[in-house]
Curated annotation (Swiss-Prot):
Its main location: cytoplasm. It catalyses: D-erythro-1-(imidazol-4-yl)glycerol 3-phosphate = 3-(imidazol-4-yl)-2-oxopropyl phosphate + H2O. This is Imidazoleglycerol-phosphate dehydratase. Transmembrane segments: none annotated. It is found in: Cytoplasm. HAMAP family: HisB. Pfam families: IGPD. It comes from Lachnoclostridium phytofermentans (strain ATCC 700394 / DSM 18823 / ISDg) (Clostridium phytofermentans). Belongs to the imidazoleglycerol-phosphate dehydratase family. The lineage of its organism: Bacteria, Bacillati, Bacillota, Clostridia, Lachnospirales. GO terms for molecular function: imidazoleglycerol-phosphate dehydratase activity. The gene is hisB. SUPFAM superfamilies: Ribosomal protein S5 domain 2-like (SSF54211).
């Protein structure tokens, strides 16, 4: 089974190419033009064992909003494409990730029904050159373009870098679990017989 995706998306605001292998080893080549976002997405790929290449040319002369949001949209599209008909996947995944004083919970249902429940208390406006309010926008974009029910909750912590990094790593671990193949599952894991 080849669980890969290649996506290209060009607008007046961003030009993005992305390649994803869900069954990789964590090799990442990320170039968004935003150093902090690159670091977070590299952590996502590494801890989820996803091979991921992202090249983004965005209107950073305006601000980082379009680049962050559109990167999330394309990553969500790639996840959806790589999962194809979701045959044999576990569908659900969750992870409670500690990082020093920080504890973050992430839970996923690859149901085809998009929803984001994001609960975090970030106390600074920026991390590097990235506005912290865009962390939520990134995960919102992924959840809606992937058709994913996504819950991310900060349980503890006060260091903003640790909180956001723990979110990305917890998301990676939960997605690795949810997208994993279970040989006991015949078809899709739904009494309806379909998962969109």
């Amino acid at each position: 089974m080849n669980r890969t995706a290649k996506i290209s998306r060009k607008t007046k605001e961003t030009d993005i190419t992305l390649e994803l292998n869900l069954d990789g080893t964590g090799i990442a080549e990320i170039e968004t033009g935003i150093g902090f976002l690159d670091h977070m997405v590299q952590s996502f790929a590494k801890h989820g064992f996803f091979d991921l290449t992202i090249k983004v040319k965005g209107d950073l002369y305006v601000d980082s909003h379009h680049t962050v949001e559109d990167t999330g949209i394309v990553l969500g599209q790639a996840i959806k494409q790589a999962l194809d008909e979701k045959i044999g996947i576990r569908r659900y995944g969750s992870f409670l990730l500690p990082m020093d004083e920080t504890l973050v919970l992430c839970a996923i249902d690859l149901s085809g029904r998009p929803y984001l429940n994001y609960q975090a208390q970030l106390t600074c406006e920026k991390l590097g050159y990235m506005d912290t309010e865009l962390v939520k926008e990134f995960f919102y974009a992924i959840s809606y373009s992937a058709g994913m029910n996504l819950h991310i909750k900060q349980m503890d912590g006060n260091n903003n870098h640790h909180i956001v990094e723990a979110m990305f790593k917890a998301f990676a671990k939960a997605l690795d679990e949810a997208s994993g193949i279970d040989p006991r599952i015949q078809g899709v894991l739904s009494t309806k017989g379909t998962v969109e």
